[in-house]
């Protein structure tokens, strides 16, 4: 079966009790409603995908090229517009322009991959950014406690290798957490309770897709 996907908003974390009265930490995700605004086909575009729109926005804040896409689809402008790749050409037949998607596309007990933008931490040193252990706290160590150490020899190799872990900007990256359990689907509120943590801040945009490594559950 083709992978399903939906755009949503992370509302925060809470905890619920399962059937055995054990506490389960969950992330609450407002999933949809999404509207299908365009369908990509191999014959016309060279690949299979579906374009989804999500979130409220004033039409005055949407530029003309994007407004044209919404007009062609016959839907009101939305805040977010994203394209989800489909597994094969046959999966395209499950969608049509103007179709509305809600949290009901997932079921209790299914597994999903959640993608979001991680929290930005600003400029961070190697201990925070990469988990370096730092240097000695005493025995002659002076003002080097949190320094990374050598980043390369002066004569050989006479340069810093690409990919060397150094201080720099941390966070604000696209992150995917795989194989998270959907603890419960609230169809009435279009809300997903996903076991565990998902990337990003409260109020951030997330993409929820069927788990690619576990298949349909």
Curated annotation (Swiss-Prot):
<keyword id="KW-0689">Ribosomal protein</keyword>
<dbReference type="InterPro" id="IPR000597">
    <property type="entry name" value="Ribosomal_uL3"/>
</dbReference>
<keyword id="KW-0699">rRNA-binding</keyword>
<dbReference type="Pfam" id="PF00297">
    <property type="entry name" value="Ribosomal_L3"/>
</dbReference>
<dbReference type="InterPro" id="IPR009000">
    <property type="entry name" value="Transl_B-barrel_sf"/>
</dbReference>
<comment type="function">
    <text>One of the primary rRNA binding proteins, it binds directly near the 3'-end of the 23S rRNA, where it nucleates assembly of the 50S subunit.</text>
</comment>
<keyword id="KW-0694">RNA-binding</keyword>
<dbReference type="InterPro" id="IPR019927">
    <property type="entry name" value="Ribosomal_uL3_bac/org-type"/>
</dbReference>
<comment type="similarity">
    <text>Belongs to the universal ribosomal protein uL3 family.</text>
</comment>
<dbReference type="GO" id="GO:0022625">
    <property type="term" value="C:cytosolic large ribosomal subunit"/>
</dbReference>
<keyword id="KW-0687">Ribonucleoprotein</keyword>
<dbReference type="GO" id="GO:0019843">
    <property type="term" value="F:rRNA binding"/>
</dbReference>
<protein>
    <recommendedName>
        <fullName>Large ribosomal subunit protein uL3</fullName>
    </recommendedName>
</protein>
<comment type="subunit">
    <text>Part of the 50S ribosomal subunit. Forms a cluster with proteins L14 and L19.</text>
</comment>
<dbReference type="GO" id="GO:0003735">
    <property type="term" value="F:structural constituent of ribosome"/>
</dbReference>
<dbReference type="InterPro" id="IPR019926">
    <property type="entry name" value="Ribosomal_uL3_CS"/>
</dbReference>
<dbReference type="GO" id="GO:0006412">
    <property type="term" value="P:translation"/>
</dbReference>
């Amino acid at each position: 079966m083709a992978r399903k996907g939906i755009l949503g908003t992370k509302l925060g974390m809470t905890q619920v009790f399962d059937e055995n009265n054990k506490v389960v930490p969950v992330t609450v995700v407002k999933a949809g409603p999404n509207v299908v605004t365009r369908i990509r086909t191999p014959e016309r575009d060279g690949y299979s995908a579906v374009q989804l729109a999500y979130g409220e926005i004033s039409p005055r804040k949407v530029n003309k090229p994007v407004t044209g896409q919404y007009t062609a689809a016959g839907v009101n402008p939305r805040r977010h517009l994203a394209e989800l790749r489909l597994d094969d050409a046959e999966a395209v037949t499950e969608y049509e322009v103007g179709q509305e998607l809600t949290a009901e596309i997932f079921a209790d007990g299914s597994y999903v991959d959640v993608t979001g933008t991680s929290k930005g931490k600003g400029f961070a040193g190697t201990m925070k950014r990469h988990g370096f252990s730092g240097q000695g706290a005493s025995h002659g160590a002076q003002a080097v406690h949190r320094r990374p150490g050598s980043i390369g020899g002066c004569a050989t190799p006479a340069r810093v290798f690409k990919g060397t872990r150094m201080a720099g900007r941390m966070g604000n990256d696209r992150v995917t957490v795989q194989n998270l359990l959907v603890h419960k689907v609230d169809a009435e509120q279009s809300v997903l309770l996903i076991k565990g943590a998902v990337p990003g801040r409260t109020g951030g945009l997330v993409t929820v897709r069927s788990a690619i490594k576990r298949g349909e559950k």
